[in-house]
Amino acid sequence: MISVEHVSKRYLTRQGWRTVLHDISFKMEKGEKIGILGRNGAGKSTLIRLISGVEPPTTGEIKRTMSISWPLAFSGAFQGSLTGMDNLRFICRIYNVDIDYVKNFTEEFSELGQYLYEPVKRYSSGMKARLAFALSLAVEFDCYLIDEVIAVGDSRFADKCKYELFEKRKDRSIILVSHSHSAMKQYCDNAMVLEKGHMYQFEDMDKAYEYYNSLP
């Protein structure tokens, strides 16, 4: 289970303190799939980072009783001076997983070839996303966080990502940030709308989208 309890997040900017999330609360059970809708700047990516543990909330608490992925295709944690393979080994040590399995899976899934042995700072954004997506799937989690990344690469690679995530791991929990109504209806059980840092929850996907589309 993931329990988000009265979570707020604020950052210090040149104009002073800016609150990005206001008193967010919800619970997610094992196997549940939740969609998050919101305009740019609504706080979606911030919420994903907090749930993953990349950042702590300013106030409130997030309780986790299941393993949670980092945001899929999030490459910000890579050390640019290290090769893709060195980053892979580092992640394997952190999560205590078999290096040979992760290496073989990543080589086959990412299709990066010899670029895996090049420094990550030489990668294009798409190559970094492929590596991050492959590593996210090579390390098994109870819950996967997806922040608008299913369109990584060409359509064939995107289809491969969808199969690995939504078919082979259909028993896992998913939090999906997307603007796509069809993706939400296909992959999620219910939806939440973030508006200016405030959360609105809907059990009916169409009602969530109706509210989302009514926003200015």
Curated annotation (Swiss-Prot):
It is a peripheral membrane protein. Its main location: membrane. The keyword Cell membrane applies. Pfam families: ABC_tran. It comes from the Bacteria. Keywords: ATP-binding, Capsule biogenesis/degradation, Cell inner membrane, Cell membrane, Membrane, Nucleotide-binding, Polysaccharide transport, Sugar transport, Translocase, Transport. It is found in: Cell inner membrane. It catalyses: ATP + H2O + capsular polysaccharide-[capsular polysaccharide-binding protein]Side 1 = ADP + phosphate + capsular polysaccharideSide 2 + [capsular polysaccharide-binding protein]Side 1. ATP binds at G38, R39, N40, G41, A42, G43, K44, S45. Residues 2-215 form the ABC transporter domain. Its EC number is 7.6.2.12. GO terms for molecular function: ABC-type capsular-polysaccharide transporter activity; ATP binding; ATP hydrolysis activity. GO terms for cellular component: plasma membrane. Belongs to the ABC transporter superfamily. Putative ATP-binding protein, and an energy-coupling component of capsule polysaccharide export apparatus. This is Capsule polysaccharide export ATP-binding protein CtrD. The lineage of its organism: Bacteria, Pseudomonadati, Pseudomonadota, Betaproteobacteria, Neisseriales.
